Amino acid sequence: MLTTFLNNLMMAMTMVTMTAPAQPQMTTVATAIDSNPNKASKDASDPRAYLNEIDGDKAMTWVEAHNLSTVDKLSKDPRYSEYQADALTILQATDRIASPSFARNGMIDNFWQDGTHVQGLWRRTTWESYRSGNPQWRTILDVDALSKAEGKTWVFEGADCLPPTSNLCLIRLSDGGKDADVVREFDIAKGEFVKEGFVLPEGKQSVTWVDENTIYVTREWTLGEVTSSGYAYVTKVVKRGQSLDQAVEIFRGQKKDVSAERGVLRDIDGKYVMDTSYRGLDFFNTELAFYPNGHTDTRKVVLPLPTTAVFSSYYKGQAIYWLKSDWTSAKGTVFHNGAIIAFDLKAALADPARVEPLVLFMPNEHQSVAGTTQTKNRLVLSILSNVTSEVRSFDFGKGGWSSFKLALPENSTLSLTSSDDESDQLFVFSEGFLEPSTLFCADAATGQVEKITSTPERFDAGGLQAQQFWATSKDGTKVPYFLVARKDVKLDGTNPTILYAYGGFQIPMQPSYSAVLGKLWLEKGGAYALANIRGGGEFGPKWHDAGLKTNRQRVYDDFQAVAQDLIAKKVTSTPHLGIMGGSNGGLLMGVQMIQRPDLWNAVVIQVPLLDMVNFTRMSAGASWQGEYGSPDDPVEGAFLRSISPYHNVKAGVAYPEPFFETSTKDDRVGPVHARKMAALFEDMGLPFYYYENIEGGHAAAANLQEHARRYALEYTYMFQKLMDNK
């Protein structure tokens, strides 16, 4: 399939080139144009408006022409085919760890993709077979066979199985990787879709089991009945055998919400506890309500907690919340942001005003909570301390709360992969930049830890080392970053270096073993830096909040400070420094390219936001106003315009030649940001690379082959920009 695709690209190149309109002479310095949004009035016509039509003929002609041009240029480099082959070998390796997930009755599930199973297999084995090292798998669903039979490129998005047996599952399938999906009922015991079972057509929707014959469905029931973010806010009850037009409304949020839905709270055994409802007021504020008297209860109870508090677990009758802001209880007790708190849920619902939690964990200034999970009898927390991990197991009994630390590897990234609700076992991955992923099975009750398997080394890390450094940002804040380079690295400013970061939505960036990065870059003499800038979750809510809305320049200052520290240490210099980031990190890259074009020689901008004046009217952009602010607010809007990459390309300025990457089927951020930014560069005579995967959603790839092609394009570009000039 991949070879055919590339051959078609090459065959079509001549025809596209012949029909493409004449373009401005490309230089590294932007030329002045009347349609530059930096100068054009708000009411001026937009010559790039046709690119707003995702699948429009004119837009797709533009996309295809630039795809062809980019692939043609980069694939002529002999390294391209080498990188693609190496990446595909790594991604499709049959000796990689089959990531496990606990299923019922001592079974282990896995979703597997390789060269034969491009779209993947959902499969199952016994725990004994899995730990043997040579598991015998039974296929539950062959997504490739289903795709072929139905003429689709189905991407498996997961399954919600009805407890306690978990035989009936609601499977979510996305056409090409979009956020919108279809839902179908599947019987695992029979290995087939349920005849005349529950089926939901494509949409951005959520679905919850109530019982074997009832589901709650939140979707766009009436055309246009979605929030400004494009998500549903009306939940209806659907009974087995009913058509969707027979569904009965049970809950309605508000159109101004980000999203809203009615759901079900269950205990660890899968037993029904009560109904809940959720309203996303913005990305970080929610109204969570409980209905203590069951499905027919119309009396909702909202606890007097901050709307930023996150409901994490229901454990032994205790509600576990993660505080994202300070809160004072009715008794006057101050609970600080970042804390994990617990209280008796049913008692709190009976008398909400008297909620008085206990603190399970309060991070210090160097710590944050990375996640929580639950086994049959234990509550488990993953904790970051200076961006390295530890895992603690908590118990609640007659004597109150107690906890201990699990004996897992120190100074590594620990990921809670899956926990068992029928025992106290959980799977934990441990990894580092130079340490391949190792899978452990831990018993959260006894503390026993067993190594199950490890990923083979995919690149030569013998001469490499990973170190943590701290840069000083513009306002004096110390910002950590990791540097992976050769132990004997010459500090002469010529080391080709990729700097990566995200810096948003309280998402921490941690060390991880990237075999592709190691094989295609580190092994060949490149250095890699990972910046833990503000906006992320490395040090809890305060670290994130410091970069919200009109404070976002701090995020960009942090990134620049890390770059300047690398240059000051003579690790690298502008001719050899490239940057890369995706989604919110794509916005970060766009801002860096515009604000400090003198610092970088290569910029990879993946699935980005770039038009911050209009982002709320593009795809799901309205849902991120809690992070970025509102363009319609006078103060926030003025700031957003000042940092919007699309509105700050200036004539007479020399910019590095960027590489824009996006996906036609990305219905979260959407491809329009990247399209219009690239088109603006084109109109201003600036060179660039552009690649828009026709499938793949916000991940920009729908299968392993597409990921391999993307890696080959990116690293060929990086080598040309950063290594070929040594």
Short names for language-model regions:
Residues 24-76, 84-85:
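Mature N-terminal segment immediately following signal peptide/propeptide cleavage
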Residues 57-161, 172, 259-292, 296-324, ...:
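Non-catalytic accessory segments flanking enzyme active sites
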Residues 123-126, 184-189, 231-241, 287-294, ...:
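Beta-propeller blade signature
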Residues 136-158, 169-173, 178-214, 218-226, ...:
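Asp-box/WD-like beta-propeller blade repeats and closely related beta-sheet repeat scaffolds
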Residues 137, 188-200, 242-254, 291-303, ...:
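Blade-edge beta-strand/turn elements of extracellular beta-propeller
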Residues 144-165, 173-180, 189-192, 196-197, ...:
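Cap/lid segment of the alpha/beta-hydrolase catalytic domain
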Residues 232-279:
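Polar, glycine-rich mid-to-C-terminal structural blocks
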Residues 517, 523-524, 530-726:
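Active-site-proximal cap/loop segments of hydrolase catalytic domains
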